[in-house]
């Protein structure tokens, strides 16, 4: 199976939430996003393993989804190395923009200087970019999900239950049920 699939994405809802869905559909149409409204039967024809607890849906046929985000990162990393990138595993303490073309990166033991630097430290990126004078409005987003192994065959594409606030994308690791995130900062315990 590929790392990324273009099978579309389906949003489903109940009739009691139709008003907000109509606005969403209208805005996306105005933005030129291709979409196809589906009744319950049409959704079930595409995804027969869904329980019919919804009334209608919309499919975005040109949408793509990642079946293996970790695999994607590994391929990008491999390509980075093949194109001459360096990987240095170190605990970074400080970044400093020395001049327009040079950044110093200091670890506990060494200092490295580079023409181009990418800060990709997840939740810890802001504390590093702040040292460069970049005021990036970045906070930590914690996402919560559950995987059901060996169930990815039950859906052929992601399905989002709009008014219930969760989605189910099929992934290499199984079906992932996602929906809850919090902007809790680095110091707060998980909720």
Report each predicted region and the residues it spans.
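Helix N-cap/beta->alpha junction signal
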Residues: 14, 69, 121-122
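Short beta-strand/turn micro-motifs at beta-sheet edges
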Residues: 45-49, 164-167
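Surface-exposed helix-capping loop/turn segments at secondary-structure junctions
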Residues: 1-5, 31-36, 82-86, 114, ...
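Residue-level signal for well-ordered alpha-helical positions
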Residues: 24, 49-50, 131-132
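Dinucleotide-binding Rossmann-like beta1-alpha1 core, especially the glycine-rich loop
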Residues: 1-40
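Helical element adjacent to the flavin cofactor pocket in flavoenzyme catalytic cores
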Residues: 19-29, 53-116
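Active-site substrate-recognition segment that forms the wall
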Residues: 3-4, 94-97, 101-102, 111-112, ...
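C-terminal catalytic lobe of FAD-dependent flavoproteins
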Residues: 35, 42, 69, 162-163, ...
């Amino acid at each position: 199976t590929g790392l990324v699939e273009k099978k579309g994405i389906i949003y489903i809802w109940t009739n009691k939430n139709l008003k907000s869905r109509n606005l969403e559909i209208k805005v996306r149409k105005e933005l030129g996003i291709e979409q196809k409204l589906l009744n319950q039967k049409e959704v079930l024809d595409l995804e027969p393993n869904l329980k019919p607890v919804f009334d209608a849906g919309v499919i975005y046929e040109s949408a793509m989804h990642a079946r293996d985000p970790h695999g994607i990162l590994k391929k990008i990393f491999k390509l980075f190395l093949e194109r001459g990138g360096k990987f240095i595993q170190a605990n970074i303490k400080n970044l400093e923009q020395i001049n327009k073309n040079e950044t110093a990166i200091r670890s506990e033991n060494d200092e490295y200087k580079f023409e181009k630097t990418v800060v990709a430290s997840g939740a810890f990126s802001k504390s590093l970019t702040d040292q460069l004078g970049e005021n990036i409005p970045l906070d930590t987003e914690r996402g919560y999900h559950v995987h059901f192994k060996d169930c990815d065959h039950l859906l052929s594409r992601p399905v989002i239950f709009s008014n219930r606030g969760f989605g189910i994308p099929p992934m290499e690791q199984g079906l992932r049920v996602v929906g809850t995130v919090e902007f809790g900062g680095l110091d707060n315990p998980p909720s």
